[in-house]
Amino acid sequence: MKEMHIIRYADDFRIFCRTKEDAVRTKEAVTAWIEERLKLEVSPEKTRIVNTRKRWSEFLGFKIRVRLKHHKYVVQSAICDKKVEIERAKLVEQAKNIAKPREKKSCLSEIQLYNSMVLGIQNYYQLATCISIDCREFHRRVMTVLTNRLNTETGSMLKHEGGTITQAEKERFGQSKMIRYVSGIDQMIYPIAFIKNKIPMAKRSIVCSYTKEGRAPIHTCLL
């Protein structure tokens, strides 16, 4: 038996081994077991060995590798390149909708949709160690679109101050200097770049969906 760590989600999984020799043997054994015992096909393109000291390994939208820090290896993770392109395109497109709302849509509803997209990205990818770097790029592209498209002959419609914010918004974004408002709209535009890495921790035993006390931490994490 060789030491290994297995991470699985649905039919996608990663196996981490200490040496290349262990990885080769594990790959052969697992492939044979899946094909012979489970009667399932294994994709040669997706089933490969990656040296995470030299290359990224992608899993569930994250890309992961290790780097040397203070004489030991630590995990470095970020949003994978394909997801960066997809999320950036969605945010930029929604920013255009804020500047020019779609038919039967208001500027407020477009801002609320954009904010929900920001929360979704931040909540999912905040476990990545380089999340702030990726989100700064998103923020830069979005603000370029909003600044250019909300600029009028009488001045910019993009303001630094606006309506009141909720307690949850204050706790999450209250310290940010990147908050912006559209003139005449009280709803703030959430700054996607105002995010930092969250260390992954095991779920507390109190958290569950069946009691009021157990649901409280879940609702708090949503904002």
Labelled PLM ranges:
Residues 1-223:
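Non-catalytic terminal/accessory segments
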